[in-house]
Amino acid sequence: RLEKKDSSLFHTLAQAMSSIVYAAEKKEIAVSVDCPENLIISHDSKWTSEALFNLLDNAVKYTPSGGKISVSVVQWEMYVEVKVTDTGKGISESNQAAIFRRFYREEEVHEQQGVGIGLYLAREIVTRQGGYIKVISEPGKGSEFSIMLPTK
C-alpha cells in the first residue's frame, strides 16, 4: 500500500542510488546526479525509491563498461521530473510499449539476469501516485526514462 506524504525527493533518490553505486563502479560507469536538496514533494518515499532503483538498475545492466548514467530532477508547474539517461544499448521504438509489460524481456538481453518485472513495477508505483513514466530511446544511442510525479 502506498502512503504519500511530504518528504525530500533528494533523500528518496539517494536511497535508490546507494543500491547501484557498487555495480556502476565495478563497470566503471560514470554516474552524475543533479537534484535540489531542498525539494519536498508528496510521494511514498519507500516505493518511489524502489521505482527509481529499477530504472537505475536497468541503466547499469544495459550500459557497457566505461559508459555514463545521469540523473536529473526538474520541477515543472504540475510535475517533478526525475530523468535517468544512459549510454546503454537502447530500445527499438517497436519495443518501447512492451517493456512495461509484466515479465517482458527483449530477445537480445537474455544474458542479463532478470525476470522482467522491474519496469512494470516502476510504472505501477508511479501511476498509483498520479504520475507516469515516459521513455525516449534509440538502439545504439542509449535511453532516457522520465518519472513524472505530481507536485500536489
What are these regions (language model features)?
Residues 91-103:
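Short conserved segment of the HATPase_c
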Residues 118, 122:
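Short alpha-helical Gxxx[C/S/T] motif in the catalytic ATP-binding
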Residues 59-60:
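Short helix-loop "hinge" at the ATP-lid/N-box region of the Bergerat-fold HATPase_c
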Residues 3-18, 32, 74:
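A conserved beta-strand-to-alpha-helix junction within the catalytic ATP-binding
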Residues 66-78:
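Short beta-strand/loop element within the Bergerat-fold HATPase_c
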Residues 3-7, 25, 30-40:
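Conserved catalytic submotifs in the C-terminal HATPase_c
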